[in-house]
Amino acid sequence: MKTPRLLQYLAYPQKITGPIIEAELRDVAIGELCEIRRGWHQKQVVARAQVVGLQRERTVLSLIGNAQGLSRDVVLYPTGRALSAWVGYSVLGAVLDPTGKIVERFTPEVAPISEERVIDVAPPSYASRVGVREPLITGVRAIDGLLTCGVGQRMGIFASAGCGKTMLMHMLIEQTEADVFVIGLIGERGREVTEFVDMLRASHKKEKCVLVFATSDFPSVDRCNAAQLATTVAEYFRDQGKRVVLFIDSMTRYARALRDVALASGERPARRGYPASVFDNLPRLLERPGATSEGSITAFYTVLLESEEEADPMADEIRSILDGHLYLSRKLAGQGHYPAIDVLKSVSRVFGQVTTPTHAEQASAVRKLMTRLEELQLFIDLGEYRPGENIDNDRAMQMRDSLKAWLCQPVAQYSSFDDTLSGMNAFADQN
């Protein structure tokens, strides 16, 4: 981060409140890592903290870990560097904590650790990127056929609680064609992390997976760092020429962690209680994936909606940055329709770049069919639909059940791209 210091400045904490420490530290920078020791004459590091704010004569730090056992007598030692982690092929098949430490393995180690990387870095420049031109085959009919994603695209999965976000993530991990899968579980329940690890243990792709976690009981700065670490791991494999798929679950809890850190450092709340820096930091993370001349990172970010009816400024901000979104419907989930993707409310902004004219024409025909069925649903609910009055409506009603069955797909069922196009073509020809 900076040149080596000739003098090292130390400080005692003036205030410890939860995970926040205030001290008169000089010559430190935002994001810098500080070691915490029992005394100035002791070398044992008992904790670490990260600089998150600078005020007049005081520095605000956020603990990495909890404050249990700390006292007024501990000493803060600036390290002059930002938080970094060792990454390499050794993390494949492993579970990492927010500091990059391997806490569990579900496959044997394949290679030694090879490189130390700072986890909070700027996105790649436009000159180093390449366009999204190749489709990403996910094996999910609704996505491959009607919402085709591209290699290097960034997609959001928007849903309220209980709509099947985790189920869709499992499908994408099991069926998507990629070299490496990096999963970041940010602010999730401990039970969900356990279940996800169990799923990966049983997966035939476990040797390709890396899981980074920071559960809801972790300090805010740890939750922020976990998302950055997951992205850093994905960037490492992209630089090795790999095709990487990155999952962050969830961006909503990452944004809340950013908010907590910003408020603790003294920032004032702005939109919906979020300080302005949160809206600066979101694109810094979301712009890091993408395709470069070496490899690619295709990213899926889940966003938890507070309500399907009310406007959500954080969800709107994330949606505006990404290259598309999959909207999961609570109504479809309640009907047992999984994956509960509301195709008409979802969009892939690179669809036209990764599909053939024939594919695009067929998808348009199926969308028109779905739009007509949605319009007819009101008449059906009111008992006003009369067969024989409109031949186009009758044709759409005849295909309704088969279209619904085609859009539904069990978690373990894989649909090849050719089969998906063939099934979609059957609906387009009848429409």
From Swiss-Prot:
What EC number(s) are associated with this protein in UniProt?
Answer: 7.4.2.8
Q: Which GO terms describe its cellular component?
A: cytoplasm; type III protein secretion system complex
Question: By its UniProt entry, which Pfam families does this protein fall under?
Answer: ATP-synt_ab, ATP-synt_ab_N, T3SS_ATPase_C
Reactions catalysed according to its record: ATP + H2O + cellular proteinSide 1 = ADP + phosphate + cellular proteinSide 2
Q: What happens when the gene is disrupted?
A: Deletion of the gene affects the overall stability of the cytoplasmic sorting platform. Disruption mutant is defective in its ability to enter cultured epithelial cells.
Q: Which GO terms describe its biological process?
A: protein secretion by the type III secretion system; proton motive force-driven ATP synthesis; proton transmembrane transport
**What terms describe the molecular function in GO for this protein?**
ATP binding; ATP hydrolysis activity; protein-exporting ATPase activity
Gene3D superfamilies noted in UniProt: 3.40.50.12240
* This protein's record includes keyword ATP-binding: yes
The record lists ATP as bound by 164-167
* Main location as per UniProt: cytoplasm
Q: What is the effect of changing residue 165 to E?
A: Lack of ATPase activity. Defective in type III secretion and invasion of cultured cells
InterPro entries per the UniProt record, alphabetical: AAA+_ATPase (IPR003593), ATPase_a/bsu_AS (IPR020003), ATPase_alpha/beta_chains (IPR050053), ATPase_F1/V1/A1_a/bsu_N (IPR004100), ATPase_F1/V1/A1_a/bsu_nucl-bd (IPR000194), ATPase_T3SS_FliI/YscN (IPR005714), P-loop_NTPase (IPR027417), T3SS_ATPase_C (IPR040627)
Q: What is the effect of changing residue 385 to F/W?
A: Does not alter function
**UniProt subcellular location:** Cytoplasm
Q: What does changing residue 309 to A do?
A: Shows a defect in the secretion of SptP but not in the secretion of early (InvJ/SctP) or middle (SipB/SctE) substrates
Q: Which domain of life is it from?
A: Bacteria
The effect annotated for residue 388 to A is:
Shows a defect in the secretion of SptP but not in the secretion of early (InvJ/SctP) or middle (SipB/SctE) substrates
* Outcome following mutation: residue 191 to H: Lack of ATPase activity. Exhibits a decreased ability to form oligomers. Defective in type III secretion and invasion of cultured cells
Q: Which family does it belong to?
A: Belongs to the ATPase alpha/beta chains family. T3SS ATPase subfamily.
Subunit note: The core secretion machinery of the T3SS is composed of approximately 20 different proteins, including cytoplasmic components, a base, an export apparatus and a needle. This subunit is part of the cytosolic complex. Forms homohexamers. Interacts directly with OrgB/SctL (stator protein) and InvI/SctO (stalk protein). Forms a complex with SpaO/SctQ and OrgB/SctL. Interacts with the chaperone/effector protein complex SicP-SptP via its C terminus. Interacts with the effector protein SopD.
Q: What is known of its domains?
A: Binding of ATP leads to conformational changes of two loops located outside of the catalytic site. These changes could be critical for interaction with the stalk protein InvI/SctO or with chaperone and effector proteins during type III secretion.
The name of this protein is SPI-1 type 3 secretion system ATPase
Gene transcribed to yield this protein? sctN1
